[in-house]
């Protein structure tokens, strides 16, 4: 057990947390019934929001006066009430963070143990955790994690009419417009947007372009129309 943080608050001075997690993600299948045969045809599956349960332990609770314990519990209630959700970092998961987490279930305080304990259920509407940020200025990169990530590509353009980045499978993003040497082109694959010199240039994305994801493993990217480039991404973990 150790502390945890939620929505920018560090709970470790007040409680110890124990992660209670399922063995795997439960998927939501999409299926279509077919006349004349039993069952249905599986079309695919969706990854629903992740449920994370923490058991909180008030180790110092037995050393507090009744009013102090009441104040502490009120403080914890306030910290856990975040209607807009927040980032959640739990014990035993290293640098992983879940985004868009909101409290959707709680138990009563159990006074069986020395300082009292309770269970708190978080629903993480972005179910794939975020790990370490990575970057590469070469053409070969290694993506860690267990889920595809969407990169950001920054290019320093040469004078010309286009810049392009492509992967080993032939997928590419092409920006076609007049460019001056030194123009900064930023391709955000998550938002499927492009800026040139800080101004929106998404309308200049060429036909056939696809803002591709990078699956875990090795990749080789090619760049054209630029004198320098940097690829940044964040590891994603189930």
Model-derived regions, located:
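Polar/acidic, low-complexity leader/linker segments enriched in S/T/G and N/D
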Residues: 1-33
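Short amphipathic beta-strand/extended segments with alternating polar/hydrophobic composition
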Residues: 11-16, 97-104, 172-178, 202-207
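Oligomerization/assembly interface segments of phage tail-like spikes and tubes
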Residues: 32, 37-64, 114-127, 219
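Solvent-exposed loop and beta-edge segments used for protein-protein assembly and interaction
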Residues: 46-50, 80-82, 112-114, 145-147, ...
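Intrinsically disordered, low-complexity coil segments
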Residues: 59-71, 178-180
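Short amphipathic alpha-helices in soluble, non-transmembrane regions
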Residues: 68-81
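Short beta-strand and beta-hairpin "edge-sheet" elements
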Residues: 82-128
């Amino acid at each position: 057990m150790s502390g945890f943080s939620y929505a920018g608050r560090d709970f470790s001075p007040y409680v110890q947390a124990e992660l209670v997690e399922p063995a795997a993600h439960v998927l939501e299948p999409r299926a279509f019934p077919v006349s004349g045969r039993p069952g249905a045809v599986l079309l695919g599956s969706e990854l629903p929001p992740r449920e994370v349960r923490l058991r909180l332990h008030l180790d110092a609770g037995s050393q507090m006066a009744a009013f102090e314990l009441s104040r502490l519990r009120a403080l914890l209630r306030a910290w856990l009430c975040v209607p807009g959700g927040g980032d959640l970092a739990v014990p035993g998961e290293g640098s992983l963070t879940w985004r868009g987490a909101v409290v959707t279930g709680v138990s009563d305080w159990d006074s069986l143990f020395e300082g009292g304990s309770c269970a708190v259920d978080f629903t993480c509407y972005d179910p794939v955790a975020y790990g370490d940020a990575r970057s590469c200025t070469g053409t070969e990169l290694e993506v860690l994690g267990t889920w595809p990530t969407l990169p950001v590509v920054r290019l320093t353009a040469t004078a010309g009419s286009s810049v392009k980045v492509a992967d080993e499978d032939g997928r590419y993003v092409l920006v076609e417009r007049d460019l001056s040497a030194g123009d900064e082109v930023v391709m955000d694959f998550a938002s499927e947007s492009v800026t040139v010199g800080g101004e929106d240039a998404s309308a200049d994305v060429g036909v056939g372009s696809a803002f591709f994801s990078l699956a875990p493993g090795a990749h080789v990217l090619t760049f054209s129309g630029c004198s320098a480039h940097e690829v940044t991404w964040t590891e994603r973990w189930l």
